[in-house]
């Protein structure tokens, strides 16, 4: 039995938690083929990484585990709504603003 796509997306974001924490902004991308996540990763500029301890010294706010949880909830919710979508590219662009995470979703279906 195959793993449902929303569960796979949740697993991917859980796997990326450490990489996402400490970023001010970036994009999570997933390549999906026949309902299976084949490749995934995070794109970001190096200057968007906040070094440990830097948040205490300035107004800089970076992603923390709680924001990753919110991103996971939003990402899986989007996939649940796209029930007929099985192949293509999905990306979640995120940015931290005033302590909260803002996310936009882009998906491109391939037939």
Model-derived features: where do they sit?
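Short, low-complexity, polybasic intrinsically disordered segments
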Residues: 47-49, 54-56, 99-111
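Binding-site signature for planar aromatic cofactors or substrates
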Residues: 7-9, 18-21, 25, 52-62, ...
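Short, solvent-exposed interaction modules
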Residues: 54-102
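Long, hydrophobic N-terminal alpha-helical segment
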Residues: 1-25, 29-32, 47
């Amino acid at each position: 039995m195959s793993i449902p796509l929303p569960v796979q997306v949740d697993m991917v974001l859980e796997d990326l938690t450490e990489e996402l924490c400490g970023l001010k902004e970036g994009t999570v991308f997933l390549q999906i083929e026949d309902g299976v996540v084949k490749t995934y990763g995070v794109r970001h500029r190096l200057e968007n990484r906040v070094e440990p301890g830097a948040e205490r010294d300035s107004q800089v706010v970076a992603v923390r585990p709680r924001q990753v949880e919110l991103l996971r909830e939003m990402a899986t919710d989007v996939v649940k709504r796209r029930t007929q979508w099985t192949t293509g590219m999905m990306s979640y662009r995120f940015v931290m603003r005033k302590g909260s995470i803002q996310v936009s979703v882009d998906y491109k279906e391939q037939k």
